[in-house]
């Protein structure tokens, strides 16, 4: 077999995954839709009550969209990390591992196909669920006695609320670069996603729960360390050193945002690299340590 990367072989692997997992993918799509639909139903009922109580129409619609933004954000976040943790679902038992490891493709092609499946595939699933949610929103309007403003596209308003403006100081000047802050948020999300990719590459059975458990343990240990540093006065000394050597200006804040973004980006790349290394060392019979 050729060792050069071939998208044709990747397509064959992905087609095989789609055929074998179409039922679980359909259930996942319905689950994402249901997780957004039932809260939306409750919010529409509440919006009808807001109208009866005399709330302004625009305020009522913005409040409804703000509530939906929180729900959609939470559902999308959970869906992305859940499917990321199942990147090695195709190898969660001995028979599947034998079948997958014997596929006529390089390990890079197999790993790349799984990456596409749990990233691009999940995004497409979410988009379909959200479009179905928007259509359902229009179909439900005649059921509720709502103002005409609710006939606007819900998702457009929801995503417009997502792009908040940067904070400003007393003079009206931005405290930091809005674009740098958005970049940091997205890189942090990618890093968080890569943690579940790494967890899914290490644990094949119940990877989502095990990765969450590992993250909780690390968070608790980090909290204890942070408390000890604060109690020892390290944070106070560090704050005094920062104030002495750096002025509290937008340039300083932007520099700090840039450094943090680069650090989290490097952590993200490392997690992806380590995930691939774990996959390349996959065996038919896993070591006992990996059976946790």
Where do the model's predicted regions map?
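Hydrophobic alpha-helical transmembrane segments of membrane proteins
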Residues: 1-98, 107-292
């Amino acid at each position: 077999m050729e060792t050069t990367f071939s998208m044709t072989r990747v397509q064959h692997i992905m087609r095989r995954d789609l055929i074998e997992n179409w039922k679980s993918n359909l259930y996942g799509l319905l689950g994402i839709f249901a997780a957004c639909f039932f809260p939306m139903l409750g919010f529409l009922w509440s919006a009808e009550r807001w109208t009866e109580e005399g709330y302004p129409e625009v305020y009522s619609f913005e409040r409804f969209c703000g509530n939906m933004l929180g729900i959609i954000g939470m559902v999308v976040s959970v869906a992305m990390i859940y499917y990321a943790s199942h990147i090695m679902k195709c190898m969660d038992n001995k028979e599947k591992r034998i079948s997958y490891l014997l596929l006529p493709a390089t390990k890079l092609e197999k790993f790349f196909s799984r990456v596409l499946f749990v990233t691009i595939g999940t995004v497409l699933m979410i988009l379909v669920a959200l479009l179905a949610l928007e259509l359902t929103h229009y179909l439900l309007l005649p059921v509720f006695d709502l103002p005409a403003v609710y006939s606007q596209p819900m998702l457009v308003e929801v995503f417009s609320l997502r792009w908040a403006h940067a904070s400003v100081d007393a003079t009206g000047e931005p405290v930091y670069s809005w674009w740098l802050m958005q970049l940091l948020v997205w890189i942090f999300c990618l890093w968080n996603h890569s943690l579940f990719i790494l967890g899914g590459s290490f644990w094949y059975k119940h990877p989502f729960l095990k990765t969450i458990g590992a993250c909780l343990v690390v968070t608790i240990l980090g909290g204890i360390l942070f408390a000890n540093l604060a109690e020892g006065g390290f944070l106070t000394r560090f704050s005094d050193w920062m104030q002495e050597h750096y002025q509290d200006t937008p340039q300083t804040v932007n520099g700090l945002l840039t450094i943090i973004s680069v650090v989290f980006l490097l952590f993200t790349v490392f997690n992806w690299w380590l995930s691939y290394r774990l996959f390349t060392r996959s065996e038919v019979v896993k070591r006992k340590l990996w059976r946790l």
